Amino acid sequence: MSQPAGSFNAGAATRGQALFNGAARCGSCHIAPSYSDVHNGPDANTPLLHDASETGMDPAYALRTATKKYRTTPLRALWQHAPYFHDGSAATLEAVVNHYDGHFALGLTAAQKADLVEFLKSL
């Protein structure tokens, strides 16, 4: 399913894509075309998983799983799947971007964050 017409700003999304793959470092884990790194595990049958500390997520949710870790969520059609994060703790894409900006000390400006959100809405 495609995004509804006019649901994101194309110019801002283009700037956001550059941030996603550059200064924001999102593309190091969220790799196209699915925007996930789950297939980059040690072998074809073992997904790549992350400790909660790597992502800044609450470890309580991961500790209830068999692996005690998180997988990188694919971002395709992300605009359809609010709330975000494994526990639904981020109500908006803005909250997601703010979380990672803080956790990774990225220092993104308000305009950069807005562009990044527009890119995420375009996936």
Label the model's feature ranges.
Residues 1-123:
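Electron-transfer interface patches adjacent to heme c in soluble/periplasmic c-type cytochromes
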